[in-house]
Amino acid sequence: MSIRVDEDLKYPADLECVRLAHRFPITGDRCMASRRKNRKRPLWHPAFWGAWILVFILWLLSFLPMGIKQSFGRWLGRLLSRRMRSRARVADANLAACMPELDEATRSQLVEDAFVASARGVLESVHAWWRNMTPYCESASVYGVEHLEEAKRRGKGVLLIGGHYSIFDFALPLIACKLEKPGYMYRPNNNPVIDRMIEHGRRRHFGIRPFTKRQIRPMLSFLKEGGQVWFACDQDFGKKSEVFVPFFGISAGCITSPSFIARESGVAVICVSHLRMPDGSYRVVFSPIQESFGEHPEQDAKVWNGFIEATVREQPDQYLWLHKRFKSRPEGAAAIY
């Protein structure tokens, strides 16, 4: 049987994909088949038994009362700050660059506090994946809902630009309960068992619809139909960083995807923050609609970076300082790590 080869298929791997497609037809969105395994391991494969044990442990932890979760998170965070030295050095480097006014002792304490906040955030996420979130949705302090109403009056969907604060999955239902048609952008976990656990836990609440970076077109359609999508885009994506804008006065690599999404879908863009307050309560803040968002990607990045910075300055331990936020550097700039 002859195989027609398009001119666009110029590489051997692409040609092999065509041959495999004729010999072994498959369904689904598959490409570059020669670079993938012929079949995925089933979730009960022995390679995933460790992940299943972890899921079982997390499920058991979800039954702990929230007060005990918070106390355990404090103990666990302090322990990890001493054991995970490489991540502690990353957090220290981030804080030294962003808050040079802090002395060494204060910065060291803030590193430990960031570990504690992150550990508590994991346990809060476990609660959100398996337990009832209604009491927290009802008791959380929420500000700026009128901006969501304004977007609705304009007949627009909403792109909610967020950040990686310590309450992350726990915050998803707190945000979604204020939305009529919620969705979110996410990066699938490399371990399929862990990914299934996380996604199942997220989708329990309010019919939230997930989108990956490979589902941009469906997400644009969802937004055009009045959907409201949460996108935490404040991490350093390495070579995918397209612009550099100030974050705490340091040039930070940013993607321009939010600008593209806003421009193509015509949505209203609103920044959102979600914090655990010192008294143990939770707070969600929606910003006013960011007018003209999507026209100038660099300016857009400055807007959402500025919003995140203002939030972090209020509760500095609540940010994910353990992430290498300044991994990408502008040409000629000194490395931070």
Model-flagged regions — what are they?
Residues 154-213, 236-246:
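Catalytic core of membrane glycerolipid acyltransferases/transacylases, capturing the structured
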Residues 12, 28-162, 195-199:
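Membrane-anchoring hydrophobic helices of lipid-metabolizing enzymes
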Residues 18-19:
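Intrinsic, low-complexity polybasic segments
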